[in-house]
Every structure is written in structure tokens, then in C-alpha cells.
Amino acid sequence: MTQRIDKALITDENAKLLSDLNEDYQALGNKLARNDINIEEITEKAQAFQIAVPSWGTGTGGTRFARFPGEGEPRNIFEKLEDSAVINDLSQCTERVSPHFPWDKVDDFTELKQFSDDLNLSWDSINSNTFQDQPGQEHSFKYGSLSNTSAASRELAIAHNLDCIEWGKALGSKTLTVWVGDGSNHPGQQHFQSAFERYLKSMKTIYAGLP
């Protein structure tokens, strides 16, 4: 496990700013009160607010054509979790992580769940991605996944989503987000109604697999 920021350091650095913070908070509270707004009620809601960190958010991302990794970028989901834990230490509002599959797939999800528990992190929505082909993929998503005219490609996309559901159950996630890259570029390339019907049929199979 990589070295995280010492929580004592965070506390010490925050303490240096506490006096100014309290002064600004009081001034803002007085201003809001003139408009019949209770700053304490807003603060209470803000303290309860939580944001899920997308696993890809800990990396440098990419361009339309390629990825250019930066120094210190996490190499796998375990390192992404470590970075996510640091974000939560600093913000105190990001206790959940939202993984993207197939990129975050692991061999042992029990191990991954234990790793996240040790970091005091839980899992938000599972993101299923079928908008690009993976190395060695038998059937292509070039012309769509869940709405592809090829039954074999549709079945492959459906199977991936069903796998995502099982992985989510193992991690304790309660939701599935399906990222669909299906579509066409020019008028006349695709029969919209037929494509939509194929998509709905695929989604019904996926929906039936939800717990």
C-alpha cells in the first residue's frame, strides 16, 4: 500500500486556517440571515452530501485518439482506491467509488471488497462499458453493442452487463449504469426504430438479471 497523507498533517494545516474560516463563516451567515436563510441548515445538508468518485477520475484520462499516462498515475483498481481514499481524507465527502468495467475487473472480487473496506470506502454505481472492443474480443462493438444488428455482438454486450451485476453484488453496489455508445454518424445509416427495439430487447434481459 502506498503512503497516504498523514491525517495529523491535514488537521494541523486546517488549524492554521481555522480563525479565518470562522470569521468568513460568520460574515456569510450574517449576510444569508438578511435574506431569511439559516446557514446552519445549509451547513448540515452540506455535511451530509456525498459524491462518488469515478475510478477513471484518479488517472490522467486521454484524448480522442490515445492515452498519455502521467507520472504517479494508478495502474490498477487497487491503486485507484488508494488515491480515492486520499481524496476522501481531504474532502470528507467521497466515501464511495464508482468502478468502470471491464477496465477495473479483477480475478478476486472478495479481495477487492476487503481492500476497499480497509480504506473505509464503499462502492457506488457499477459502470458497464461496451463502446469499444477489448483485446481478443470475439465479436465487435464497432457498429453497436446492445442494438447491434449482429445477434452475437448483442449477446456479448448483454453477457458483460450481467457480469457487471454479479461483480456489483460482490462489492455491495446497489445500482448499474449502462454506458451505450450505439448510434450512427449520418442520415440513413441506421433504422432508428429497429435499433431501438433491439436495444430494448437487450435491456429487458439485463433488467431481468438485477437482484
Predicted regions and their residues:
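Alpha/beta catalytic barrel-like cores
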Residues: 1-149
